[in-house]
Amino acid sequence: MKLILLAYFAVLSNILSSVEGRVRYSKRPNHKLGTAEYAECMSNAPIVFNRFDASYYTRNLSVVFNILGYSSVDANVTFDIIVEAYGEQRARFTFDPCEINLNTVCPVARDTAITTQGILPVSPQDVQMIPKIAWGIPDFEGLVRFRMYRSEDIAASSIDNSTPLACMIATLNNGHTFKNKVVKALSGTALALSIAGVLGFYVIGMEHSTYLTRQVFINSVPSLQHMGELLQCIAFTGAIGITQPKVLVAWASNFAWILGFITNKEIENSLESFRKHSNGNLSSPKIGGVHRRDAVATNPQSPIPGFYHGFQGLATEVGTLTTNLFTLTLIWFLISLAIAGGIVIIFVLIIKFLRQTRIIAKSSCDYITRYWFRVLFNACMRWVLVCWPVLVTMIIYQFTLREAYGPVILAALLLALLFGLFLWLTIKVIRVITTSGLSNEDNPETLISDPKIYTWWGWLYLDLKERRWLYVYACFAHYFSFALVLALVQQFAKIQTILLFVIEIISFILLAVFRPFVGFKNSFCVFLVALTRVVSFALLIPIAFDLAIIPKVIIAIILIIIQGLVFSFMALWSLWNFITMLGTAWPAISYTVPWLRRLIDEYQRQLHIDFENPAVSASEKLSTEEIIPQESNFEEPSTTKKEGNVDTKEDGNDDVFSLVNASPMRPASTIPSHSCDNGINEMQRTV
């Protein structure tokens, strides 16, 4: 029995000792700080570096470094390494490389390459100088300054009064950052879900009547416009011309793709070739960008790593040059515009195929198939409207660089095209209003419901109230003034942040006073995005002033939390809108989203009232004001002739529908209620 007890205690003691050892081992710190971006901080240096890597490991208390360079002098050298964190010097190491057996620099020889790899031991006292927060905080604000001096100069005076032979500066990275591919994927998914949800409900609304399409579009939010403006706001916060905390630039870079800042090695090589053939200066100090660990050359005029300023800092974080930003934006804008147009064309071809094969009714979606070019025009112009702030901003910013004439010419042509489109649009609408007699102030709603206007220009004011359609010009003025300040005042951070805040305040006040957007949910999204812009640029004002780096980081984190919460809310709302759209469209699921059910019930009720008593006044019908105000009727004065289920004008102008019985529209008796369109006696507004 005693032997059994002794054996039991022996086994138990071994288990406890092994567990204790594992616990002690797991509690040992295993932190790491390593260099990321680097650049030379001295021009015309006798010793130049092509590579500088350094990593500090807390477990073995050592710094491992790797240096590649070239020497043009003979000298005995002394290394000086300074570690800075959050604006303060935390550690300094001055030593003779011969003491740690760095033979290639002991001494350095003229016209020889330097290849040095070494391990520098660190004392526990030096480790205590580095704050513990450095090991876990995202986007650690740290720098390493590496200099080489002549040993004779240091012996004759002091190291601070000596002239270095070489100088490098590199940022420190602890492996934690707000720059994350998951956030990029989530932002792209949220934008795609918002588009898919709106388009899905748009088609569902056409299954019942074109009368419902505008109401459905406004109630299925957030839309492309809402989500696009929010993503642009977050991305632009990283492009303000202030010395920004690294954490804010890293966060903004997740959304830089909405600005067209998407690049890879092949695109960069093509852009460099384009700039080279248009007298581009590759060593211009305005180019921006610094080198990472896989770089093989260093530009002495690049921005100092760790100091992120305006578009240069955002370009560095994205991995491109500032002179390439406009060209990247233009390339991806044209690609996205082609994708939007291709989706519309493919959809029209699918509808035609389904009609030819009689899978759907012969007259289903007649408006889309007959007037596909108007649908295509509305879709493309809606995307141009979303991209307008980005395009104007990058055009004006390209003018400030003046580094190569090729991108400047492209920017000038695009600016002329955009403003030509704006002027043509204004002249066209004014001419239609004048010639059609729609300028009567007693009945401004006819502008909204006139087929000569909204079938072409509905993308401008689709979500605006009838009496507030001119608010779209206030939006253009807002975008243009924002672009001017953001692009032209990059070198005056304090003035820029204050002006941007004033612009957003004025825009928000106009929005609150006029309340131009129709529908509660639509207005809520607009107000939420506008308020986010105001708060974002308000928080950037103190960062523009001479605050210490730690208060700047705290303000930046508060801004990230606010923007992150708003983005998460809008993304979840887009997901819910998409899910409810799928549930409504799926035949096996007998579910209809409540607001759509109310719209359909109201439409059916008004159909019944109009069928029993066509002379009943519209004011006696049940109001749908809680969902969206009714559109006013517009009856074309000319006589019409019936062609199937479509009313066309007898004078041969078949590009305009007559809106007889436009509100509500009676379903055609020969077409089932589940078809895409019930006869199209009413002209729909297209996106």
Swiss-Prot record:
It comes from the Eukaryota. GO terms for cellular component: cell division site; membrane; plasma membrane. Keywords: Membrane, Signal, Transmembrane, Transmembrane helix, Transport. Residues 632-653 are annotated as: Disordered. Residues 1-21 form the signal peptide. It is a multi-pass membrane protein. The chain crosses the membrane at residues 186-206, 331-351, 376-396, 407-427, 469-489, 498-518, 524-544, 553-573. Residues 638-651 have a biased composition (Basic and acidic residues). GO terms for biological process: fungal-type cell wall biogenesis; transmembrane transport. Coiled coil: none annotated. GO terms for molecular function: transmembrane transporter activity. It is found in: Membrane. Its main location: membrane. Pfam families: TRP, TRP_N. InterPro entries: TRP_C (IPR010308), TRP_Flc/Pkd2-like (IPR040241), TRP_N (IPR032800). Belongs to the transient receptor potential (TRP) ion channel family. This is Uncharacterized membrane protein C663.14c.
